[in-house]
Amino acid sequence: MSSRPSVVGPDSGPEAPYPLHMEGKVISGFGRGSKELGIPTANLPVDEALTPWIASIPSGVYFGYASLALPTTHPDIPSASPNGPPKAGTEDALLAAEAPANPPFHIFPMVMSIGYNPFYKNTVRSAEVHVLHKFTADFYDVPMRLLILGFIREEKDYKSLEALIEDINFDCEVAKNSLAREAWAPARGRVIGGKDLEGKLDVQWLLRDA
């Protein structure tokens, strides 16, 4: 059992300097997230010209939300309705006719690492995002936006791969617990894989038109 807190951040919501924003197309990483850790990651390029704040924040583990513009052919794209098409003539049917069947961006909770990962002795700073959803297919080159809401812990070295995996799994639980509060949950839009609650967090940046 970890001695770290299972929730981070005040119940009142994110505090300055958060939220932080980051976006780009998903790139291939070191190839060890799924292979060695069983924790697949979607990487974004670290570009200080686009995200000048990234040079001044500590290396470590962060959490928040990611939005992905999955292509309509992707096997994990959410269905417009889990119960099938709405009955003709109902209010749901009218709303469905007005809204796109597949919105361009879908929101997921995420936990991410920004840093060098001392266990692997990386020489280049990376941004590795673990989307808290089980995907059946990759989504390289897909546009991804990040709304970073808080800091979980500093990065550190580990004596074993097992210790690293244990800490990452606990990071995921901390992220889920921390986001399962009214001020940390979206005010609009559906979060896939998150708690089913109506929150107050503005996530329009994740869903905006490009």
Could you tell me what each predicted segment is?
Residues 2-210:
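Phosphate/ribose-recognition catalytic cores of enzymes acting on nucleotide-derived substrates
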